[in-house]
Amino acid sequence: MAVTDELLGPILRDVSRSFYLTLRVLPSTVRSQIALAYLLARTTDTIADTQLVPAEKRMQKLQQFRARIRDEGAPPVDFTHLAREQDNEAERVLLQHSGEAIALLDKMAGADRGQIQLVLETITRGQELDLVRFGDGRKLKALETADDLDDYTY
C-alpha cells in the first residue's frame, strides 16, 4: 500500500471516526487536502492531549511540529517517546506516520500548502494556549476574562 493510500485510508479512518465518512461527499479536487489537514490537526491534538507526558514536554513537541509544518527546512520531530505513551493504537500509528504526513504537505501545491499551514497555525496556537492555561488538566480552572473566553472559543 502506498504511503498516501495508507495515510488517507486506514490511518485516517481509524483516528477520525465519522469525519472519514464525510470526506466521501467532498469534491475530489479538495478531498486529499482536507484529509491531510485533518490528519495534521489530529496529530497536534494527540500531542497536546497525551496526559502521561508532562505539559512542558507536550508544549515543546507541539511547537516543534508547528515549526516543521510551517517550514520545510525545519528539523523532523521525533515522536518515539510520545507514541509509546499512547493508550490508543490508532493515535500511536498516527504519530509514527507524522513524518509521512509532513512529506505529503511538502509536496502540495503552494496555495493548498499555504491554506493548510494557516489552519494548523490557528489550531496549534489554541492548543498551546490550552496547555498554558490548563497545564496537565487535573484541576478545573476557569477563564479569567470575557476576552479569554472569546479567544478560547475561537
What are these regions (language model features)?
Residues 1-154:
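Acidic catalytic motifs of isoprenoid enzymes
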